[in-house]
């Protein structure tokens, strides 16, 4: 059994995705989230958008909902010091261990989507799918 990658390697992998830049559109993330069973559809979400004040607004909403007894997830970007700041559950940052686990799980799922094996006349052939997530798409999938 191969050794699990370290937090440092997981973060390095995430930042390596920045080479794919920003790609407009939702097709890739929708396709990928569908392969995960559309986890976003099982959540009640508040999407905060705009130019200024998103972080403060989200922190306020998070605080109010936690005090009201809700389980609250918060996904923000960018982070200030550590990547872990981007994903919080009930005010607590995601752990290094959980980041490593999620990066590996999503990498494997992408690999499965890219190289599905198809049985054609008793010959196994790899079938390539173009599913390369950007940094933002990958980290969004982690949050779900």
Could you tell me what each predicted segment is?
Residues 26, 30-41, 67-144:
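ATP-dependent carboxylate-amine ligase catalytic core
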Residues 52-54, 79-80:
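Short active-site-proximal "capping" loops at secondary-structure junctions
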